[in-house]
Structures are given as structure tokens and as C-alpha cells.
């Protein structure tokens, strides 16, 4: 199922996700190449009015950390499924569809 998702859609990430990926301290040279290729192939959602307002709503209602709230807001504002290994922080958000890629085949 995960490969179907990956192969069927262009990846989309929040600007926060891009920053987090590029700040990975232990990334090898190969990791950096893969990360840069992934980012190049992705739509990177910048902060805009819609994402800003949704972030404020999420922060107030669910008390998420700002980066997680921006990531969730980016997915919601663009009607995307959030793919993350950090499901616990996101599964309480109303209308946000969350998939843990490491649990798809379990």
C-alpha cells in the first residue's frame, strides 16, 4: 500500500519538514543526496494565510508544538494524508488523515 501511495502521488511536504530533513545531523553523504532528490521531487508548501490560520486553530485546540502544528495544518489546508511515524502527536486532530508507513503491513 505504501508503494502505491508513493508511486501514485507527487510527494508534498511542509516547509518545516524540508527544514527538518536538511538539518539531519547524522545524515551521510548518500542520505543528503536522497533527501535533496526527495525535496526536488516534492511540492514544498510555504506558509500562507490558509496554513497560518489552520496552524493557530490547531495550536489552540490541541496544544501541539509549533512545527507539528504547521505540518498538520499544511496537510489539512491542502487536503492531504499525513504520512508520519509520529502518529501519536497527530491522530487526535479532527479531519486529519494520518498513516504510519511502518505499520501498513502489520
Describe the residue ranges of each PLM region.
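Acidic, PIN/NYN-like endoribonuclease modules and their adjacent C-terminal/linker elements
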Residues: 72, 76-106
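Short, well-structured N-terminal submotif of metal-dependent ribonuclease cores
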Residues: 1-13, 23-36, 105-106
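Short loop->beta-strand "edge-of-pocket" segments that line small-molecule binding or catalytic clefts
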Residues: 10-13, 40-41, 81
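Alpha-helix/helix-capping structural signal
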Residues: 16-19, 50, 88
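Short, flexible helix/strand-to-coil boundary loops that buttress conserved ligand/catalytic motifs
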Residues: 6, 25, 59, 94, ...
Amino acid at each position: 500500500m505504501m508503494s502505491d501511495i508513493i508511486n501514485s502521488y507527487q510527494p508534498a511536504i511542509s516547509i518545516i519538514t524540508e527544514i527538518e530533513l536538511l538539518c539531519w545531523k547524522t545524515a551521510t553523504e548518500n542520505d543528503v543526496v536522497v533527501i535533496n532528490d526527495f525535496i526536488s521531487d516534492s511540492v514544498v508548501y510555504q506558509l500562507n494565510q490558509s496554513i497560518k490560520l489552520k496552524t493557530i486553530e490547531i495550536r489552540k485546540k490541541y496544544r501541539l508544538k509549533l512545527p507539528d502544528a504547521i505540518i498538520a495544518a499544511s496537510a489539512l489546508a491542502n487536503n492531504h494524508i499525513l504520512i508520519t511515524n509520529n502518529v501519536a502527536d497527530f491522530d487526535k486532530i479532527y479531519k486529519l488523515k494520518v498513516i504510519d508507513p511502518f505499520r501498513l503491513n502489520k
